[in-house]
Design a protein with these regions (language model features):
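Transmembrane beta-strand segments that form the barrel wall of outer-membrane beta-barrel proteins
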Residues: 37-50, 56, 67-79
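Membrane-spanning beta-strands of outer-membrane beta-barrel proteins
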Residues: 40, 51-53, 85, 144, ...
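Outer-membrane beta-barrel transmembrane domain signature
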Residues: 102-204
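Feature captures outer-membrane beta-barrel proteins of Gram-negative bacteria and organelles
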Residues: 34-36, 54-68, 86-97, 195-201
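Flexible, solvent-exposed coil segments and beta strand-coil junctions
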Residues: 34-39, 67-74, 126-133, 176-179
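Repeated loop/turn-to-beta-strand initiation elements of outer-membrane beta-barrel proteins
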Residues: 65-69, 98-101, 158-161
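Mid-chain, structured segments of secreted extracytoplasmic proteins
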Residues: 79-113
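Bacterial Sec-dependent N-terminal signal peptides
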Residues: 1-34
Length: 204
């Protein structure tokens, strides 16, 4: 039987491994990023997906156009989340398959990546509050680690590489996955995964 302490240790190791995996391509492209303008390469608007009811983000992609790094601000209104939630998310997206062209569409059939979200507020914390025993909460309530897989399609508009497109993502996070492992008989698979739909505006 899988225990909560085992899940907690697996979670910590999981985070370290993922950060190492995603840090290597980012570091390799640091010199490229420094030479480019600070103006973002694209803007994204996302619906759902675990980072807010609606989220607005912007970010950069490398020259090979197979890695994107974005920063999002997401909002969940009180009537949906019980309290107003403001969520800051850093998302790293890897596009391992080259662009497939069909008529005027540029299709990326596979995207995958990592999202790290922080939710500020008195009811959320990174470490156990002083009035609770050590490791009372197995996961920090203010921090969420998510994984996703999806795809995107772009359509060029005008000149200078500008385009507009849409993307989808199917994802989950560490809490939902661990709860499913511990309580697979009572938790439906539909409660573990979430779907995101978004629009992407290429600026340069």
């Amino acid at each position: 039987m899988v225990t909560r302490s085992a899940i907690s240790n697996m979670y910590k190791i999981f985070i370290i491994i993922l950060l190492l995996i995603f840090a290597s391509p980012v570091q390799a492209n640091d010199s490229v990023m420094q030479k480019r303008s600070l103006w973002p390469d694209h803007i994204k608007l996302q619906y759902a997906g675990g980072i807010g009811f609606l989220s607005l983000g912007s970010g950069y992609e490398n020259r090979r156009k197979n890695l994107q790094a974005d920063l999002y601000y997401g909002y969940v209104p009180e009537k949906l989340g019980g309290v107003d939630m403001h969520i800051i998310t850093g998302k790293f997206t890897w596009l391992p398959i080259r662009t497939k062209k069909w008529k005027q569409l540029h299709i990326r059939p596979l995207t995958t990546g990592l999202a790290i979200s922080y939710t500020p507020g008195n009811q959320y914390f990174l470490f156990d509050p002083e009035n609770y025993p050590y490791n009372y909460y197995k996961y920090p309530t203010a921090l969420t680690l998510g994984l996703f897989i999806g795809g995107q399609v772009q359509r060029p508009i005008g000149k200078r590489s500008k385009s507009i497109g849409m993307y989808y993502e199917l994802g989950s996070n560490e809490r939902a996955l661990s709860n499913f492992v511990l309580n697979s008989r009572t938790i439906s698979i539909t409660e573990v995964f979430h779907l995101a739909l978004g629009a992407r505006f290429q600026l340069k």
